[in-house]
C-alpha cells in the first residue's frame, strides 16, 4: 500500500500544533483549535499522529465546568535530546537538554582552545563521554549546537573572525567532521539569545545582553 504524501502545509500545521503544546505545557484539543483557529477534527487528527510519532502524550484529563472532560496533552519531553558544546578560550561547556528545553546535565571542563585536529577530536570524545554518563543512545540525539565567540558566516559556513580565540576563516567542516551528529554553529551571543527565546516563547519581543 502506497504511503500518503504529506504536503508542506500539513507539515507546517503539525509543527504549529506541536510548538503550541510545548509552549502551553498542558493543553486540550479544543484549546489548541481555539487558539490556532483550526477546526477541532483537524487538531484531533494531528495530535493523534503526533502521539503515534511519540512526540506528545495524553496526560490525564483537564477539569471541566460541565460536560465531558477533555484529555490533557503534553509533549514527550525526553523522546529526543539535544547536546550543546560551548567553546571558549580556556574551557568547553557541555550541555544536554530535552525537547522542553530542560537541562538534564551540564559540565564545564578546563580545556584551552587550539586550532588543531587534535583539539576538535578531543572535544568530540569529551562529548561522547559526557553523553555516556547519562546512558544516552546515539539515535536519541537530534544534533549538537556548537557556540563559538566569533563572527559566523552561514553562507560561507565558517567562523570568519574571533578575537577571543585568535582565529580567522575557521570552516564549519573543519570542526563538524569529528562529531557523530548533525552540527549547527552559532555565535555565542546568538546561542544565548536563542536559548532565552526558546524558554520565553510567549514573549514576542525581548532584548538580550551578553
Residue ranges and their predicted role:
Residues 69-106, 207-210:
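Gly/Thr-rich phosphate-binding beta-strand-loop-beta motif of the actin/hexokinase/Hsp70
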Residues 23-24, 100, 199:
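Short helix-capping/turn signature of helix-turn-helix
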Residues 1-34:
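Extreme N-terminal segment that seeds HTH/winged-HTH DNA-binding domains in transcriptional regulators
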Residues 58-80, 185-207:
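Conserved phosphate-binding catalytic cores of ATP/NTP-utilizing and phosphoryl-transfer enzymes
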Residues 107-205:
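Glycine-rich phosphate-binding loop and adjoining helix at the ATP-binding site
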Residues 26-58:
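N-terminal helix-turn-helix
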